[in-house]
C-alpha cells in the first residue's frame, strides 16, 4: 500500500502546485501520473548488464563485477556488490518515476523479509530522473 500511497501523493502534489502531472527537469519531461512502473532490483540489473544475479553467491557476484570492469575491493560483501552494480549500471537510467523493489536481504538486513522469497526484503526506492526520490 505504501507505493500506491506515495505515487498518489506525488501526483496530487504536482497537480495542486503545477496544475499538471508533468514537470520539466533539464531536458526531460517527467510525468508523475500514477501508477508508476515497478521493477525488481535483480530484474533491473539483468536488463542493464545482461547478468542474472538470482541465486548467485558473493564470489560469483564478485566475478560479475570483474567482468563488468568495476572497481571493487575485498571489504565489499554480497549486498554492497549488488548495490554497486545497480548504482553504476541501472540507477541513472530511470527518468520516469519507477519503483525499484525486492532488494536482496544483504542490502537491508533490518527490513522485513519478503512474503514469498526469504532472500529478498519488502523494500522499495522510487527513482526519478536518474536519482532516488524516496526509500521505504
Language-model-detected regions and their locations in the chain:
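Metal-assisted phosphate- and nucleotidyl-transfer catalytic regions
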Residues: 9-131
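Catalytic palm subdomain of template-directed nucleic-acid polymerases
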Residues: 1-4
Amino acid at each position: 500500500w505504501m507505493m500506491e500511497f506515495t505515487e498518489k501523493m506525488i501526483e496530487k502534489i504536482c497537480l495542486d502546485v503545477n496544475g499538471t502531472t508533468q514537470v520539466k527537469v533539464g531536458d526531460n519531461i517527467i510525468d508523475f501520473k500514477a501508477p508508476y512502473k515497478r521493477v525488481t532490483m535483480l530484474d533491473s540489473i539483468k536488463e542493464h548488464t545482461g547478468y542474472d544475479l538470482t541465486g548467485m553467491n558473493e564470489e560469483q557476484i564478485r566475478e560479475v563485477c570483474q567482468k563488468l570492469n568495476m572497481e571493487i575491493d575485498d571489504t565489499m560483501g554480497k549486498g554492497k556488490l549488488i548495490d554497486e552494480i545497480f548504482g553504476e549500471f541501472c540507477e541513472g537510467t530511470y527518468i520516469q518515476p519507477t519503483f525499484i523493489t525486492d532488494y536482496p536481504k544483504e542490502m537491508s538486513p533490518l527490513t522485513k523479509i519478503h512474503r514469498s522469497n526469504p532472500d529478498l526484503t519488502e523494500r522499495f526506492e522510487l527513482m526519478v530522473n536518474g536519482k532516488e526520490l524516496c526509500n521505504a
